[in-house]
């Protein structure tokens, strides 16, 4: 598989793509919904349980990374060298496909959020605009992973500003919020409570919806072939991303609960209004920019990781070998990236995602 690569460190190569996938669109658009369904205590239990599972996975990955010479392919490489290429391929191929399809989901999410936020973009065909964004993401990642990761620093700054705006915010005006409670019942607490209870989902359903939000560590692990010292960078970057992600999510849900208070009307708004977090914020624009950035960073992370998994599979003969061909001094997997793009484009054009 060669030893070519960019020579990234733990922060740039592992922590950055991992944390930007963990702090994603679910935090902005679905975390209020989680709180509205199960309350603060159970939200923290869901967050802790989900993070604990990811943390144990991170420890396992770290143990593998420190006990072998890690090359390109991330989780696939480590599994295949521990349990055999056949077992590795059985996991690596679905992993590649899931990351390629995720590029389509994140790109479409970015375009929908953009079109909903910008008046002149109303009416644009989401599929066509998504294809344009896909081309831009492909161009950024296929010619220079270094440039793509540098772009993620700006995305990280946008997400940081959105969090500052949120933490400086306060309780939103109930009149500006969408609500599961009809206007006629807003002042009738008994009727409002009955409506909210009928619309609320249980602990396990909410856990199933939220859990994928904190599993973004494979974006960083997938950069293993481009790390200067994978045995050090993978454990350090992965565990740091998990812990920072937990701290951010815990802080956000505690502040959300404080802003919403004990009002049943606010709980109804948490269930219905996806922009509740933005409407709590001191300034709305940084949060909208944060939502765009979260979608775009996740698309970039998946577009960086997926081709490298496919490249490693091809080097092992599990997929056609021409897909593993690398270009330039850094062994960029352009053929694998092209296939990733094609899969993502097909999913985008299927529509309704």
Give residue ranges: language-model regions.
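Membrane-interface "cap" regions at the ends of multi-pass membrane proteins
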Residues: 1-62, 66-74, 184, 193-196
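Membrane-water interface regions at transmembrane-helix termini and the short interhelical loops
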Residues: 30-37, 64-66, 90, 112, ...
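Helix-loop-helix junctions that connect adjacent transmembrane segments
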Residues: 43, 121-125, 157-288
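TM-loop-TM module centered on a large, flexible mid-protein loop between adjacent transmembrane helices
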Residues: 77-78, 116-120, 243-300, 320-353
């Amino acid at each position: 598989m060669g030893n070519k690569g960019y020579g990234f460190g733990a922060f740039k190569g592992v922590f950055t793509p991992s944390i930007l996938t963990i702090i994603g669109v679910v935090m902005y658009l679905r975390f209020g919904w989680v709180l509205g369904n199960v309350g603060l205590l159970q939200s923290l239990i869901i967050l802790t349980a989900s993070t604990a599972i990811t943390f144990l996975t991170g420890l396992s990955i770290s143990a593998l990374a420190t006990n072998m010479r890690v090359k390109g392919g991330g989780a696939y490489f480590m599994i295949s060298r521990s349990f055999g290429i056949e077992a590795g391929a059985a996991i690596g191929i679905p992993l590649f496909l899931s990351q390629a399809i995720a590029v389509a989901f994140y790109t479409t999410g970015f375009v929908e959020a953009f079109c909903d936020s910008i008046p002149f973009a109303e009416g644009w065909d989401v599929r066509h605009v998504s294809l344009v964004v896909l081309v831009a993401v492909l161009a950024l990642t296929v010619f220079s992973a270094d440039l793509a990761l540098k772009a993620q620093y700006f995305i990280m700054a946008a997400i940081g500003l959105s969090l500052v705006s949120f933490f400086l915010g306060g309780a939103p005006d109930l009149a500006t919020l969408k609500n599961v409670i009809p206007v006629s019942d807003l002042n009738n607490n008994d009727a409002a409570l009955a409506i909210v209870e009928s619309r609320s989902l249980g602990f396990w359903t909410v856990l199933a919806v939220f859990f994928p939000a904190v599993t973004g560590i494979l974006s960083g692990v997938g950069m293993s072939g481009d790390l200067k010292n994978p045995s050090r960078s993978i454990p350090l970057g992965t565990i740091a991303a998990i812990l920072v992600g937990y701290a951010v999510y815990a802080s956000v849900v505690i502040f959300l609960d404080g802003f919403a208070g004990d009002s049943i009307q606010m709980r109804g708004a948490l269930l219905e209004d996806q922009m509740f977090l933005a409407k709590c914020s001191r300034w709305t624009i940084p949060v909208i920019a944060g939502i765009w950035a979260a979608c775009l960073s996740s698309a970039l992370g998946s577009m960086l990781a997926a081709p490298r998994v496919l490249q490693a599979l091809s080097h092992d003969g599990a997929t056609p070998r021409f897909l593993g061909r690398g270009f330039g001094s850094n062994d960029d997997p352009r053929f694998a990236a092209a296939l990733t793009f094609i899969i993502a484009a097909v999913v985008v054009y299927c529509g309704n995602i």
